[in-house]
């Protein structure tokens, strides 16, 4: 369960004062990932590419304590678990939202991913774990290549968010440009940079 904490009791105290009421507290980083290993595993094990990337996102975030905090309204909340959100095309042709609880067991994460994305697609009902988990949002624009995307500050959803398009085939590798948006109250640029480095490392050693 999430619980409200006093920002003054955390390392985010000064960031809370500086950024909670800023006109636009969201920051976006851009990075090109080498996803060659994910392509190989996807083909070898017949696993979905986006599932593998979501798994690596959860694993990369899990060791960074800032990912267990999130500003919600005027409060700073602390979580015990992380979930990764994926957008699903449902049976009506529209999109639904599906949160997958992160586990460091790839087989279990894959089972949950397949089970709940199919369920959401059929029922057209979102699966929301935000009451219990700090959710990392993701969106895959698979119809085209994109260089990046900058989100907007809604003032409602402060969750970290990643977006990507099609991966790009190079001579000896596959590249994937990604955008990572985060709330400055939750983390600083150094934490976001560490996460993106972790993400590349997790992709390489999966």
Question: How should each PLM-predicted stretch be described?
Answer:
Residues 147:
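Active-site cores that bind ATP or allylic diphosphates and position pyrophosphate for catalysis
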Residues 1-13, 22-24, 36-41, 58, ...:
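Domain-scale detector for complete catalytic domains at protein termini or as standalone homologs
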Residues 38-63, 176-195:
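Acyl activation and transfer enzymes in specialized metabolism, enriched
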Residues 26-31, 38-44, 95-107, 187:
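Acyl-group handling in specialized metabolite and lipid biosynthesis
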Residues 48-54, 58-70, 75-76, 92-96, ...:
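Active-site loop/lid in soluble adenylation, ligation, and acyl-transfer enzymes
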Residues 90-144:
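Helical lid/core segments from catalytic subdomains that handle acyl or acyl-like groups
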Residues 6-8, 20-52, 68-84, 135-136, ...:
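Gly/Ser/Thr-rich phosphate-binding loops and adjoining beta-strand/alpha-helix segments
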Residues 130-143, 160-197:
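Histidine-centered acyl-transfer/condensation active-site motif
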């Amino acid at each position: 369960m999430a619980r409200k904490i006093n920002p003054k009791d955390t390392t985010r105290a000064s960031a809370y004062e500086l950024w909670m009421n800023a006109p636009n507290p969201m920051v976006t980083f851009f990075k090109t990932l080498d996803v060659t290993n994910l392509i190989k595993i996807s083909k070898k094990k017949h696993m979905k590419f986006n599932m593998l990337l979501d798994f690596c996102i959860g694993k990369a975030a899990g060791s960074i304590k800032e990912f267990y905090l999130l500003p919600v309204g005027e409060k700073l909340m602390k979580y015990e678990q992380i979930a990764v959100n994926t957008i699903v095309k449902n049976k009506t042709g529209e999109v639904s939202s599906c949160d997958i609880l992160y586990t460091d067991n790839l087989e279990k994460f894959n089972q949950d991913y397949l089970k709940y994305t199919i369920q959401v697609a059929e029922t057209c009902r979102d699966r929301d774990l935000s009451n219990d988990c700090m959710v990392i949002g993701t969106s895959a624009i698979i119809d085209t290549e994109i260089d990046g995307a900058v989100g907007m500050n809604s003032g409602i959803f402060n969750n970290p968010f990643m977006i990507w398009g099609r991966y790009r085939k190079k001579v000896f590798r596959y590249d994937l440009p990604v955008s990572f948006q985060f709330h400055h109250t939750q983390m600083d640029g150094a934490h976001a940079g560490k996460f993106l480095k972790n993400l590349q490392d997790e992709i390489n050693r999966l």
